[in-house]
């Protein structure tokens, strides 16, 4: 009888996912831990590895189809495979496993006494058999470092954790990185015969585009948007960045204007805390957030992603610059984790990098505000009674009018302008 592999719970509270790509087909011979498919949820693309070795008999769910946790997605001829219980799917096998707990109590190992704090939000890559093994040993699998392919946790890693040691990183990481690059290379489009005066072609909506569309529609339908547009002379900011650009480069930091904007926004969120909340109309609650995490909208080949700079209020301009650059590289390479894209309290969208100026950015719901920054352009301004040319930055602030009144929004915008106009004040207040 073929082993029926069901879509496992891939975490983040997501109960379904779209099969983006299959890496196997009927007749393929696979080994345990080989990647079967890529699954897209609302937050990221996740690789689904095989828990068994064997031969693929049948792929049950086509690419582009949404599967629910517990659905059979592929059948594998794996004679030696035991029935496995997957998180998110209950069947009679669970009752069969209960007596096994009493068979060999002597094998129960004491819970490891490591004192490090465990990140309960960490995304874990591990086979169901390894998860079960960790539970039997009394180990919190989120505390274990993975040495397998793509950081996957193995039984040896669990044993090493129990012994108080750290696993050695696998040499497969370099090879896996190469494989990922190959896997992410888009396939050449199929030849299409275009006829008539108005030729058209169709394609399935990609998983990432579908997730983006869902988020945009939800935000616009839920939050009444108001957008304020303004501009500010940033000559002093321009000079400040120029002064410290070489110093930053000496320590490997690429200094841009964006970290300054992050610090200015954080200062505004602290001064006007209504912008750092969520409005839960169904529960009749306003959630006040006493942390300042800034999302940075990033344009990638896959679509719009929003990595998050956590605790931006605690970081320097240089630190924020480094983190933004690192997250941008991960976004372009498709290697952002779900944890790196959650937890934002307010977001920045930089249309200026594409040459844009003012626009109406869509709030990243359930946040209540988003700051849009446009290009810096030389414009005539009046300074000390004279018309002079100066670099001017375009700003657009969208906010949820259910929570934020117009005057509050404009006051926040004025505060941001004041800080960007005078970077020394920004450093004092930020």
Swiss-Prot record:
Protein family according to the UniProt entry? Belongs to the 2-oxoacid dehydrogenase family.
| UniProt-listed Enzyme Commission number(s) | 2.3.1.12
Q: Which cofactor does it need?
A: (R)-lipoate
Q: Where is the composition biased (Basic and acidic residues)?
A: 84-104
Q: What is this protein called?
A: Dihydrolipoyllysine-residue acetyltransferase component of pyruvate dehydrogenase complex
Originating species: Staphylococcus aureus (strain MRSA252)
Q: Which enzyme class, named as a word?
A: transferase
Any idea where the Peripheral subunit-binding (PSBD) domain is?
125-162
**Coiled-coil zones:** none
| Residue stretches making up the Lipoyl-binding domain | 2-77
Q: Which InterPro entries match?
A: 2-oxoA_DH_lipoyl-BS (IPR003016), 2-oxoacid_DH_actylTfrase (IPR001078), 2-oxoacid_DH_E2_comp (IPR050743), Biotin_lipoyl (IPR000089), CAT-like_dom_sf (IPR023213), E3-bd_dom_sf (IPR036625), PSBD (IPR004167), Single_hybrid_motif (IPR011053)
Q: N6-lipoyllysine-modified residues are where?
A: 43
KW Nucleotide-binding (keyword) present: no
Q: What does this protein do?
A: The pyruvate dehydrogenase complex catalyzes the overall conversion of pyruvate to acetyl-CoA and CO(2). It contains multiple copies of three enzymatic components: pyruvate dehydrogenase (E1), dihydrolipoamide acetyltransferase (E2) and lipoamide dehydrogenase (E3).
Spans traversing the lipid bilayer: none
**List of catalytic residues:** 401
The UniProt regions of compositional bias labelled Low complexity, in chain numbering, are 168-192
> What interactions and quaternary structure are annotated?
Forms a 24-polypeptide structural core with octahedral symmetry.
Annotated GO molecular function terms are:
dihydrolipoyllysine-residue acetyltransferase activity; lipoic acid binding
What is catalysed by this protein?
A: N(6)-[(R)-dihydrolipoyl]-L-lysyl-[protein] + acetyl-CoA = N(6)-[(R)-S(8)-acetyldihydrolipoyl]-L-lysyl-[protein] + CoA
Region entry Disordered: which residue ranges? 80-122, 165-199
User: What keywords are annotated for this sequence in UniProt?
Assistant: Acyltransferase, Lipoyl, Transferase
Query: Which CDD domains does the UniProt entry name for this protein?
Result: lipoyl_domain (cd06849)
A single GO cellular-component term from the record reads: cytoplasm
The answer to whether the entry has keyword Acyltransferase is: yes
């Amino acid at each position: 009888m073929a082993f029926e592999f069901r879509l496992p719970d891939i975490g983040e509270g997501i109960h379904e996912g779209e099969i983006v790509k299959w890496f196997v087909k009927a007749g393929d011979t696979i080994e345990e831990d080989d990647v079967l498919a890529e699954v897209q949820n609302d937050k990221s693309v996740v690789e689904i590895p095989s828990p068994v070795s064997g031969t693929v008999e049948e792929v049950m769910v086509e690419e582009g189809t949404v599967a629910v946790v517990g659905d059979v997605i592929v059948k594998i001829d794996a004679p030696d495979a035991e029935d496995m219980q997957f998180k998110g799917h209950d069947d009679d096998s669970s009752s069969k496993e209960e007596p096994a707990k009493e068979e060999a109590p002597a094998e129960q190992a004491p819970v490891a006494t490591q004192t490090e704090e465990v990140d309960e939000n960490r995304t874990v890559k591990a086979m169901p058999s390894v998860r079960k093994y960790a539970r039997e040993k009394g180990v919190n699998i989120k505390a274990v470092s993975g040495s397998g392919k793509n950081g996957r946790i193995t039984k040896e890693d669990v044993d090493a954790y129990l012994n108080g040691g750290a696993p050695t990183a696998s040499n497969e990481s370099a090879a896996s990185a190469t494989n990922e690059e190959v896997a992410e290379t888009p396939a050449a489009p199929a030849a299409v015969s275009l006829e008539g005066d108005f030729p058209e072609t169709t394609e399935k909506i990609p998983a990432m585009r579908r997730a983006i569309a869902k988020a945009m529609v939800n935000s616009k339908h839920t939050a009444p948007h108001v957008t304020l547009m303004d501009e500010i002379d940033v000559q002093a900011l321009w000079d400040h960045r120029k002064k410290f650009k070489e110093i930053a480069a000496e320590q490997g930091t690429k200094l841009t204007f964006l970290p300054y904007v992050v610090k200015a926004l954080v200062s505004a969120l602290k001064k006007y805390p209504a912008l750092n909340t969520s409005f839960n109309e169904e529960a009749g609650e306003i959630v006040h957030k006493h942390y300042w995490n800034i999302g940075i909208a990033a344009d990638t080949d896959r679509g719009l992603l929003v990595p998050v700079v956590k605790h931006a209020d605690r970081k320097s301009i240089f630190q924020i610059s480094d983190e933004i650059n690192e997250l941008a590289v991960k976004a372009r390479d498709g290697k952002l984790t779900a944890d790196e894209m959650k937890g934002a309290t307010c977001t920045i969208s930089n249309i200026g990098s594409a040459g844009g100026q003012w626009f109406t950015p869509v709030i990243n719901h359930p946040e209540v505000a988003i700051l849009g920054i446009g290009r810096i352009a030389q414009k005539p301004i009046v300074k000390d009674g004279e018309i002079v040319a100066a670099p001017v930055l375009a700003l657009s602030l969208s906010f949820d009018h259910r929570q934020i009144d117009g005057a509050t929004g404009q006051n926040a915008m004025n505060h941001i302008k004041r800080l960007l106009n005078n970077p020394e004040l920004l450093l004092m207040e930020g």
